[in-house]
């Protein structure tokens, strides 16, 4: 297993998963800077390819997904591995629970069955060609997608290391060459220096745009619909986090009066819960406290928190990011 994360999260990852500090079977890869998902996934995939060969199957999964029934995800991944061994880039599609505008969508095409035995086997297990990836839609378009049995794109990809490298060599040859250069010195004293030299030159692009969309246009991407009972939650915003916290209790000391659906998140860096937060007449809000900042937002505005992050970046407040 490999984890790719930024320098700021290194100590936190090792505190939760100390076995990654020194293990032949577990690898912690630290990005010098954020270069979007293609660079992060590519780094891990090319190191796996260097260590285990072209046929090694790699899967990429975000760390901020909550899965209520992981056994159903395992079933989908097993199906995806079969299609990946047949040369497809495979993604896991999720059955929408609402007409959300927060996620991209996948238009599933026909079942994988090119007249060969492998294609028929993949089709029997539920794998389908991807007809199209579509960006986050407006509300009306999202409703049409759900009615047409589109799937949510959760950004989970399974592919052989060699197939990924061949697509990247064709579509982004400079990135391919630099990732090969980095992976070639994995496990040697030259790795950190080689990573630092090449990393800033990698194209900053999501894997969806770099590989998934163009390869899907050529018929090379498959989707495996996960079971509708999977119980998937994207914990990428306070709307989702608040939904979890209000069921499990606040992550901080809070007193709520006429404030149903509100939640408090406290992280003061010293294992303390921080001050008592009293919420009166403010339902469905999220309050986050850190040692140097406080955020208050309505749950239905959770997606807009990115605007605060952008403003802080423009002001050079890297200490708060």
Where are these regions (language model features)?
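Conserved N-terminal catalytic core of the sugar/cofactor nucleotidyltransferase
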Residues: 1-62, 67-72, 94, 300, ...
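A conserved hydrophobic position in a structured secondary element of the catalytic/binding core
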Residues: 5, 61, 137, 159, ...
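Solvent-exposed alpha-helices and their adjacent loops that cap or buttress functional pockets
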Residues: 21, 50-53, 59-60, 67, ...
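Conserved beta-strand segments of alpha/beta enzyme cores
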Residues: 27, 129, 222-224
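A short acidic, often aromatic-flanked loop/helix-cap motif at beta-alpha or helix-coil junctions
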Residues: 34-39, 98-100, 139-140, 231-232
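Residue-level signal for inorganic ion chemistry
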Residues: 44, 64, 106, 160, ...
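Conserved core of the sugar-phosphate nucleotidyltransferase
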Residues: 70-198, 219-220, 299
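Left-handed beta-helix
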Residues: 162-321
